[in-house]
Every structure is written in C-alpha cells, then in structure tokens.
Amino acid sequence: DGLSGDIWFFTIYLCICLRENATSPFFSSHPWAIWVLAVTAGIFHAKQAATADYYRQFHLYFLKGEEGSELDSSVVLRKKYDEMPWRGHFWSKLVLFFYSNYTANQEALSPAMQKLRAELQRVFKGGTASKAFRAEFRKGSLPLMKYTNILSFNWRSIALFVSILCKMPWLYFIFELVVLNGILVYMISRHEALCRRLTKELKAGKFQA
C-alpha cells in the first residue's frame, strides 16, 4: 500500500508543478523553483509514508500476529527475488524488486527496531513473543499510532485540498516539508527510544515467560 501511495502522489506532484508553471506569475518566471520544491518534498514524502506504514505494521504484528500484519524482511524478500526466474514471472519479479527496496528503506530508517527484531528472534527462537512483551510494546507503541495516521493518506489529502481551494497548491509542499517532517522526526525519536529500551530489557532477561 505504501509503495502504491508513492506512485499515486508522484502523479499529483507532477500535476501541481505543471499547473503552477502555467498559472503562477512567480513560478512562470522561475520554472525550476517548483520542481526543486516538489522533488525535495517527494523525497521526504517517501520517508514519511514508509516509516508510518512500517511502524503501523510492527504494532499490528504484536496486536494480531503475523496474519494481521504485513511486516516483511528485506532479506527474505531479496532471497525470493533471487530465486524467482524472470521467465514467466516478469511482472511478479519486477514488483518484488521495488518492494524489497522499499522494505530495505524502511529498515534503514529504524536501526533500533531492527536490533529489537533480532533480539526477539534470539530470545524466542523465531516463535511468538511472550504475552508480557507484547503488552509492553503495545503500551509504548499505541500513543504513536496517531502520528502514523497523520503521516498517512487522509491528512495529506485534507492539506492538499485546502491548498488547492486557496489557489496555492505549492503550499502543500511546504506543509509536507515543515509540518509532516517535524512529526516524522518526533515519531522516529519516540519509537527508536522504545525499541532501545525493550531490547535492553530483553537482554536483561525480562519478558522471558
């Protein structure tokens, strides 16, 4: 869903740039400006959406288990990609290529979370985490879910529609760079701190039963 959303918003960004260069006196005189703004916002958009989606899936993993979550591993996905032949699987392999890179980007933005996943694998031997751990993680993660919602589709759409109604679509890029990036930094800081604490407690022998 996150990867599809990136493609969807790419078309929106493109349309905003074309519209502003055609109708705005400032951007008509400086056509490069809107493109620089759009590319910068787009880069951060991808990071915001990917991180929000990843945190949400990790939360669902401890709430509903594997069946209720789409939590993946780039290592596993890359192995599937390497083992899948191009012949007869062209589109599936192409999608897997982009999705494995998308997942790798999510993992790169959450180093403490990756250490926590590795420690969970070690402590619980690849099985289900203890009830005590799952409860403790959900307790710390739940307050952050409101930020994942803000960084998702609905709030972006509202900001986009407001900027269009104000006849200043470029304001959406400013909203993304200033407001959403601020939320992203805060959310990552909180989530990584949670993961570091739980990793330390797991190593100390807590949540074993």
Where is each model-derived feature located?
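C-terminal membrane-associated helical module and adjoining short loops/tails
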Residues: 44-45, 54-209
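Multi-pass membrane catalytic core of lipid/isoprenoid biosynthesis enzymes
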Residues: 1-49, 160, 165
